[in-house]
C-alpha cells in the first residue's frame, strides 16, 4: 500500500508539486493538472518536459485524473471529444507508467429528466474497452455525475460496464439524488 494525492491541489507548477510531495515523504503523485491544464490537454512538447521532470525527480504517477466524462460534460456532448481525450491519454499514461485513469459518467441532468442511461452505458463501455485494450484500467470516480446519484446508480454502472472499477474520493460530495 502507498499514499498518493492530487498534487495540483498543493500547487499549479510541477516543481512545486514535486516539492510538496517529497516534503511529506511520498514518492507518487495522482496526476491531474500542471499549470492549470489537464495532462491530456497539454501540448506535446510541454507534456514531454513534464514527463522528463518526473523521471528526473524519481516521482511516479500511478493514477491519472482525467476530464473524460466528467461533471462538466453533458451526455449529449459530441463523443468525438471524449475519444480524442482517450487517444491523447493512453500514450501519455504509457509514457509515465501509469496504470489507472479516473473517469466519470457525464453530468447528471436535473432529477426527473431523462438521464439517457443507455447512451451513458454505451459510451462508458467504449471508454473502458479502449483503455483495457491498451492494458490500462479505467476507474469510475464518485462525483457530480450519473454514477454519483446513489449507491444504486453506482452498482448499476458496474453491472452495465463489465470490468469497470470504482474509486471513492472522500473529498467529493456525498451521494445524493439531486444536485441540480
Segments predicted by a language model, with ranges:
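Alpha-helix N-cap and loop-to-helix initiation/capping positions
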Residues: 41-49, 77-88, 112-123, 145, ...
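Short low-complexity stretches enriched in small and charged residues
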Residues: 16-24, 58-59, 93, 120-127, ...
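N-terminal pre-domain/capping segments
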Residues: 1-98, 132, 165
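Active-site groove signature of glycoside hydrolases
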Residues: 93-114, 134-143
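Residue-identity detector for glutamine
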Residues: 12, 17, 53, 94, ...
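Acidic/histidine-rich catalytic cores of soluble enzymes
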Residues: 64, 128-180
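Active-site-proximal loop/turn and secondary-structure-junction residues that shape catalytic pockets
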Residues: 9-11, 33-35, 67-70, 105-109, ...
Amino acid at each position: 500500500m502507498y499514499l498518493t494525492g492530487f498534487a495540483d491541489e498543493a500547487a499549479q507548477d510541477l516543481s512545486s508539486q514535486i516539492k510538496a510531495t517529497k516534503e511529506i515523504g511520498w514518492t507518487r503523485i495522482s496526476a491531474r493538472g500542471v499549470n492549470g491544464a489537464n495532462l491530456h490537454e497539454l501540448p506535446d512538447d510541454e507534456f514531454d518536459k513534464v514527463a522528463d521532470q518526473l523521471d528526473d525527480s524519481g516521482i511516479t504517477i500511478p493514477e491519472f485524473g482525467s476530464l473524460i466524462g466528467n461533471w462538466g460534460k453533458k451526455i449529449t456532448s459530441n463523443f468525438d471529444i471524449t475519444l480524442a481525450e482517450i487517444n491523447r491519454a493512453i500514450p501519455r499514461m504509457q509514457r509515465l507508467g501509469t496504470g489507472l485513469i479516473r473517469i466519470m459518467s457525464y453530468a447528471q441532468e436535473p432529477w426527473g429528466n431523462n438521464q439517457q442511461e443507455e447512451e451513458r452505458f454505451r459510451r462508458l463501455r467504449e471508454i473502458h474497452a479502449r483503455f483495457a485494450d491498451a492494458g490500462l484500467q479505467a476507474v469510475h470516480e464518485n462525483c457530480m455525475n450519473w454514477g454519483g446519484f446513489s449507491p444504486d446508480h453506482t452498482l448499476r454502472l458496474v453491472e452495465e460496464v463489465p470490468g469497470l472499477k470504482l474509486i471513492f474520493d472522500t473529498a467529493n460530495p456525498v451521494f445524493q439524488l439531486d444536485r441540480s
